[in-house]
Amino acid sequence: AWLEERLALYRATATAYTTRLCFIIQGWMANDEVNRLHDDLNSAFAGRVVLEQQMILDEDLDQVPVMLRNPGYFAPFEIFSRLLPLPKYSSYDPTPLIGLFFPLLFGMILGDIGYGMILLLLAFFLARHFPPGTLFSNIGKVLGISALYTLVFGVLYGEFFGDLGETWLNLHPVWFDRGKAVVPMIVFSLTVGVAHILLGMTLGALAELRRHQPRKALIKLAMLVAVILTVLALVGWFYPQSWLSTGPLLIAIGILMPILIAAEGLLAPLELLKTMGNIISYVRIMAIGFCSILLAVVANRLGGMTGDIMVGILVAGILHAFNLLLGVFAPTVHSLRLHYVEFFSKFLDLGGRRFEPWQKPHP
């Protein structure tokens, strides 16, 4: 402990510059703690130590250390953002975005009232039996929020352990039966994908403005417009509407693409194709959810075919437990994949340096 304390002291004093009459210490600290340090220095040294804040210059942006700090609702979702390298100071903390969209995608995929109730009970158990801030407590909180979305989408889909609600409780979908309405579910998934990706591209343009790179911001906004035009053209192609004419849209794309190619080279059309591929990836929301409802229906059918109510409950219970296990694992993995690969690639700049304040080592 003594050796660690001495090493910490030497690391801190290595940044100090001293003369016979004065000393200078330079370092980083959180902006909201500057006033407290100023008051502490005045109290301890009666104004003989001067604290000066310096503006962060553009050339120093990559050197600024990063500390993730999120309020109550978003804090548990740091278990996902910490799986990634830290974002750079000029980028964004991805935690709030994960906190907003991960439970939504999770609920869209699982979407079952019965499964949501079980997950809510499990989340309550984890949150109650583990100290706040620990891994399992945070998992419980994330699971609880995701379970609420699962309940909401379960009501919209009319699912209670698959089709058990329809058979026993006369439960019907508020929105649509995703086990039968495959095309509407595909359209819904792609719509969510378009909104998610466009948000990411908008954040990417704003990030370039924060770095004082207006040219790059304009290029990203132009690509955003190209994606919107392409999506509208595809909608008009597959679902012709009187108000949506594909001709002017294709002309606009034809005018915009040469401008992007002049600015970005041949990477511009490839980036457009890549972005469309990112959007298509959201079809997995429909595919995984469809598999989940089919497995739930199979569990109910096999349970009903046994001829014995106790054996049927046992068989159906085992199969539903297996489906629930898959129903937690698959939505988690694929929701995170949609964030890490499709969404964050549009704006998140990773590789930040962790903020490590000077302090005595903990015993």
Tell me what each language-model feature is.
Residues 26, 35-363:
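Conserved, carboxylate-rich catalytic/transport cores that coordinate ions
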Residues 1-37:
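Coiled-coil termination/hinge junctions
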